[in-house]
Curated annotation (Swiss-Prot):
This is Major core protein OPG136 precursor. Pfam families: Pox_P4A. It comes from Monkeypox virus. Keywords: Virion. GO terms for molecular function: structural molecule activity. Interacts with P39/A4.
Length: 891
């Protein structure tokens, strides 16, 4: 017996091998009407991976990705300016993301469950995030991954020993940091952006504001570094006439640029002295505490919420020196003003105040629940059906959140259960293959299989299989083609056409149809003898042998005319030759006709378009031929007969030849980066298709409840509206699109109604003839024999006619109601559901007729008008004394 640890599981496979296992083992056990949850059709990708490769973002929710980018920008700025965190192992520079190789400062409280998975199929930053998540605490992983808590209560508050500031607002921090076109300055934190070849106006204004506080000795170096002179000329600013800087804290119009100097430039450029009320301030820390407190006064309470231990006072002491250099300590106390001491951690708190200010004037980010971060409750996961469990575990990485020592960790769900821990939430990461999530590919594949119709199998060959010659003429022409060789292209075309015309003139008999087995050989010989470049490629698609014949240049009528004119033929002569050889030319031009777009899309990949330098005739004619593979060629007979034991026979892939071709096709689809579920379906061999079940066998539909839902609208007089309502009534149990099915069923009822109304009209006419004869007899008695027939007799006869028409119409309604119920049952059965009604009642018949009545209303009105006409005609001939005593009433 094989050891359990040596069994290969799906999470250990990648690319085509993984997708093949999914399609061949998981897909056949899903019903065709299986619904894939919309939340599982997208996945999570780290924004850094998306920045490096935009195509990776196609498998994510765009609103969720944008929210993560905003949150990640905030967390990155907090992390890089902090002295303690340093959780990110990257440095974001202009246009690139540099990975830091030194160990990351992560928590010493590592996950007690050891992670043994590598996740090599994931992009690098997503893979790294996942490794951090399964190693460190869940809280730190969420900080690095840009997690945002969703609206609502269906999420988990993770436990952690220490938490970091959680700010949430729309921003473009990451885009600004990664902006490519910036000035290459030694100070990397400040990005001086270049727009249209010149320093941006916003950055220019900020740099000019900072420049006024830089000493005169350092200003030239500052100007050269940031191309201040060029930008000043561009914006019409004269640097020599700039006003003198205001360096007194009591009269400064703004503290913004002084704070910017402290944030970015303090280590590279010297600053001019700063004064308070004419006295020079001695200590830089007091200057920054004063300026930042004054500029962000309204945000100090918000700062205290995040950092309760930060010192906040109602005054600040500035150590200054007066003009005589005497020490003067100034205590600044202003009404309703607080002063914060940022503890010499200037860059972090300046950055954090900027974040708080941005938060104050921005909108908060709102997101929905993330299957990757929030997941679902473990009890909800356990309550899922076996089908759902199988699908989720085979198409997604499945993680679990659990608590240990008052800390929340994340691990592979199976590892948590093996470690006898209790999961709280189950998080899912759908896998990606070929640029699409596997969950979405499976959904598309099921839809493609479900939407196929019986008419598509087998597909009849619509190609023209003759060239207008009898069998004798065709054999003569075939022999002549074999003699054509090594002649110029134009000459060869002319000689072949003329040879055909010569044989055609004396040919008699019905056209000889080319046999299928000889078709490809004749095609190759015909075009090669004319000097075309003919190449053949063969492959396997599904359970069919595919032959692709490429003919260059492309064969068209205009090309043949032009080529004949190059061989000294006038245009009239060329037209006459083409007219005489119409059947041959029609055969040549039509061989590449495609009536199935998907087949063309698939087959075209086997024969890529060629490019010709300077040639206008670069396109080619593609001929595709498909032949089913024989059952013996589909089976691995050698593997079966070489097996000596039951285990060896069980391990043999019986359909190895076509499965191997299927893997190769999947690999090619994945490499193209444009794989779809329809691609997989077209390449799927019959041995897999034959094993797919049509329905799960658990969906039941009540015909009465369904009719109740459908007949809630009384104005449904169009087929499309009825179709929509039927689909809506079935939407809770099936996922297939039944529009075509419903339309066909209702149209069949309408056609049946037309036939039945014809039968009803004929029977009514025959019965009306009896009443007409009876009315004629009464008329004769009264007019010829002058005997009076009382009105009661006449009224009785008319009432009997009315009863006859009512019974006929009632029978007609019952018949149509039954036909409509048959159509409903057909729709339900074809949709993969069962009927759970014990019996169909009279009320169901009434509902059924009410549903179809708008479609047959014109026929009902026709029958009523016809019956009314007979009634009024008889009533007129009866000449009743009281004509109003009886009347014809319809519905």
């Amino acid at each position: 017996m094989m050891p359990i640890k040596s069994i290969v599981t799906l999470d250990q496979l990648e690319d085509s091998e993984y997708l093949f296992r999914i399609v061949s083992t998981v897909l056949p056990h899903l019903c065709l009407d299986y619904k894939v949850c919309d939340q599982l059709k997208t996945t999570f990708v780290h924004p850094f991976d998306v920045f490096l490769n935009n195509s990776l973002g196609s498998v994510t929710k765009q609103d969720e990705l944008q929210a993560t980018i905003s949150k990640l920008g905030i967390n990155y700025l907090i992390d890089t300016t902090s002295r303690e965190l340093k959780l990110f192992n990257v440095t974001l520079n202009a246009g690139n993301i540099d990975i830091i190789n030194h160990p990351i400062n992560i928590s010493s409280e590592t996950n007690p469950i050891i992670n043994t998975h590598s996740f090599y199929d994931l992009p690098p930053f997503t893979q790294h995030l996942l490794n951090i998540r399964l190693t460190d605490t869940e809280y730190r992983a969420r900080f690095i991954g840009g997690y945002i808590k969703p609206d609502g209560s269906d999420s988990m508050d993770v436990l952690a020993e220490k938490k970091y500031p959680d700010l949430n607002f729309d921003n473009t921090y990451l885009f600004n940091i990664l902006y490519k076109d910036v000035i290459n300055a030694p100070i990397k934190e400040f990005k001086a952006k270049i727009v249209n070849g010149v320093l941006s106006r916003q950055d220019f204004d900020n740099l000019i504001g900072v420049r006024q506080y830089i000493t005169a000795q350092d200003q030239p170096r500052f100007d050269i570094t940031y191309n201040i002179a060029d930008a000043a000329r561009h914006y019409g600013v004269n640097l020599n006439t700039l006003p003198l800087p205001n360096v007194d804290l009591t009269t400064m119009p703004t503290y913004k640029h002084l704070i910017m100097y402290e944030q970015y430039f303090v280590d590279d450029y010297d600053r001019v002295p700063i004064y308070y009320n004419g006295n020079r301030v001695i200590f830089n820390d007091e200057i920054i505490n004063f300026t930042i407190s004054m500029r962000y006064q309204s945000l100090i309470p918000r700062l205290v919420d995040f950092f309760p231990d930060i010192p906040v006072n109602n005054n600040i002491v500035l150590h200054t020196r007066d003009p005589q250099n005497a020490a003067v300590n100034v205590t600044v106390a202003l009404p309703n003003v607080q002063f914060v001491d940022i503890n010499r951690n200037n860059k972090f708190f300046i950055n954090f105040f900027n974040l708080l200010a941005k938060e104050q004037r921005s909108t908060a980010i709102k997101v929905t629940k993330s299957m990757f971060w929030d997941g679902i409750d473990y009890e909800e996961y356990k309550s899922k059906t076996l089908q759902d469990m199988m699908f989720i575990n085979s198409t997604c990485y499945v993680f679990g959140l659990y608590n240990h020592n008052n800390t929340t960790y994340c691990s592979i769900l199976s590892d948590i259960i093996s470690a006898e821990k209790t999961p709280i939430r189950v998080c899912l990461l759908p896998r990606v293959v070929g640029g699409k999530t596997v969950t979405n590919l499976i959904s598309e594949t099921l839809k493609s299989i479900s939407s196929i119709t019986i008419r598509e199998f087998p597909r009849k060959d619509k190609s023209i299989m003759h060239i207008g010659l009898s069998e004798t003429g065709f054999m003569r022409f075939f022999q002549l083609l074999r003699l054509m060789a090594d002649k110029p292209h134009e000459t060869a075309i002319k000689e072949v056409v003329m040879a055909y015309v010569g044989i055609k003139l004396g040919d008699k008999g019905s056209p000889y149809y080319i046999r299928k087995e000889s078709y490809q050989d004749f095609i190759y010989l015909l075009f090669a003898s004319m000097g075309f470049k003919v190449t053949t490629r063969r492959s396997i698609m599904g359970s069919n042998n595919i032959s692709i014949i490429s003919i260059r240049p492309r064969v068209t009528k205009q090309y043949i005319v032009t080529t004949l004119m190059k061989t000294s033929c006038s245009k009239n002569e060329a037209e006459k030759l083409i007219t005489s050889a119409f059947d041959l030319l029609n055969f040549m031009v039509s061989v590449s006709d495609f009536r199935d777009y998907q087949s063309y899309r698939q087959y075209r990949n086997y024969c890529p378009r060629y490019f010709y330098a300077g040639s206008p005739e670069g396109e080619e004619t593609i001929i595709c031929d498909s032949e089913p593979i024989s059952i013996l060629d589909r089976i691995d007979t050698r593997g079966i007969f070489s097996a000596y034991t039951i285990n060896e026979m069980m391990d043999t892939d019986i359909f190895s030849p076509e499965n191997k071709a299927f893997k190769n096709n999947l690999s090619r689809f994945i490499e193209s980066g444009d794989i779809t579920g329809e691609d997989i379906f077209c390449a799927m061999p019959y041995n897999i298709l034959d094993r797919i079940i049509t329905n799960a066998g658990t969906c039941t539909v009540s015909i009465g409840d369904m009719l109740d839902n459908i007949t809630t609208q009384s104005d449904c007089n169009m087929t499309n509206e009825i179709t929509d309502m039927i689909n809506a009534s079935l939407k809770n149990t099936i996922s297939k699109d039944n529009n075509m099915l419903v339309s066909q069923a209702l149209d069949s009822v309408a056609n049946r109604s037309k036939q039945t109304i014809g039968d009803l009209r004929q029977s009514s006419c025959k019965m009306a003839l009896l009443f007409k004869n009876l009315a004629t007899s009464i008329y004769t008695i009264e007019r010829i024999f002058n005997a009076k027939v009382c009105d009661d007799v006449k009224a009785s006869m008319l009432e009997k006619y009315k009863a006859f028409t009512d019974i006929s119409m009632s029978l007609y309604k019952d018949l149509i109601a039954m036909e409509n119920l048959k159509a409903m049952l057909y729709i339900i059965r074809r949709s993969g559901c069962r009927i759970d009604d014990a019996q169909i009642t009279t009320d169901d018949l009434v509902k059924s007729y009410s549903l179809i009545r708008p479609k047959i209303l014109s026929m009902i009105n026709y029958y009523n008008e016809m019956s009314r006409g007979y009634f009024e005609h008889m009533k007129k001939n009866l000449n009743m004394t009281d004509g109003d005593s009886v009347s014809f009433d319809d519905e």
